């Protein structure tokens, strides 16, 4: 689905004088492969390069060196960009910068009109997109009247309506409250599980990545670590090296283990930890 090979992306950091201006590598020879239908998380501290990488997935940025292939089409070739941007949709941190319609329905239809989708098909896609994000009752609402979570769900509906194979959520939950974050992540998981859409989640919230098929850890423009949540979260010191923390429930499980409770690690979900504690209390679980 997506293959990144030896990707380098630099930007100019301007100083007070021309002599002080330097070139900074935001991405430094990145290699990555993402298969169709996977739920991928890309994590890292601020400035690690994760959002810069995300913008290469649908040709918003172009490689200085290396290649990004989307379904075997290179983002470096202008003729491929239209198809690539139909294949990979993006949702960004601030939905106000992405919503342009006077109503929710009008906003979702914008991309479909640009694709010249017939009216009957367009209406069907809008209906299915609204249903997928649980916003059917807000069809005629003014986006300005919506909550932050509802605006982000509207942006997701618009991105999904064009029938992409891949959806990139670039810090899409960063401005949301915990409840809205859970709703957005839940929708992403459903799109992945029920529709087979490849999800690429860019985030710094560790509790959002526990169900990912694979996690890539970015640090100073390189892929520093990669693996499943179980592989990466078994070692708290690994994430600490990159200024990241374990998910709260995983940290709690480690703390209980250190205090002598025979908790089996790593723990990903509160329900899982509660179940283990109940079994320990009943004497059904020991070290």
Question: What spans do the regions from the language model cover?
Answer:
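The feature captures the beta-strand-to-loop junction immediately N-terminal to the Walker
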Residues: 43-45
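Conserved ABC ATPase "signature" region
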Residues: 120-138
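Helix-to-loop junction immediately C-terminal to a conserved catalytic motif
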Residues: 58
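Conserved ABC transporter NBD signature motif
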Residues: 66-76, 84
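Catalytic Walker B motif of ABC-type/P-loop ATPase nucleotide-binding domains
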Residues: 167-170
């Amino acid at each position: 689905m997506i293959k990144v090979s030896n990707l380098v992306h630099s930007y100019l950091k301007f100083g007070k004088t021309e002599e002080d201006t330097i070139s900074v590598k935001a991405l430094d020879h990145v290699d990555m492969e993402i298969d169709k239908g996977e739920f991928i998380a890309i994590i890292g501290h601020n400035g690690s390069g994760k959002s810069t990488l995300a913008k290469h997935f649908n040709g918003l940025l172009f490689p200085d060196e290396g290649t990004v292939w989307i379904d075997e089409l290179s983002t470096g070739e202008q003729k491929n960009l239209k198809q690539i941007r139909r294949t990979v949709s993006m949702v960004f941190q601030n939905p106000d910068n992405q919503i342009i319609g006077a109503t929710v329905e009008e906003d979702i239809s914008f991309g479909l009109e640009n694709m010249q989708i017939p009216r009957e098909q367009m209406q069907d896609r809008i209906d299915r997109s609204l249903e997928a994000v649980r916003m059917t009752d807000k069809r005629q609402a003014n986006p300005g009247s919506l909550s932050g979570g509802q605006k982000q769900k509207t942006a997701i509906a618009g991105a999904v309506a064009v029938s992409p194979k891949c959806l990139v959520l670039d810090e899409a939950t960063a401005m949301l409250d915990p409840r809205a974050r859970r709703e957005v992540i839940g929708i992403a998981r459903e799109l992945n599980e029920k529709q087979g859409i490849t999800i690429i989640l860019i985030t710094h919230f560790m509790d959002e990545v526990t169900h990912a098929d694979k996690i890539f850890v970015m640090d100073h423009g390189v892929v520093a670590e990669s693996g499943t949540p179980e592989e990466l979260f078994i070692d708290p010191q690994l994430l600490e090296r990159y200024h990241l923390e374990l998910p709260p429930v995983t940290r709690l499980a480690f703390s209980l283990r250190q205090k002598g409770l025979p908790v089996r690690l790593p723990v990903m979900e509160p329900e899982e930890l509660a179940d283990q504690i109940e079994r320990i209390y009943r004497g059904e679980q020991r070290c």
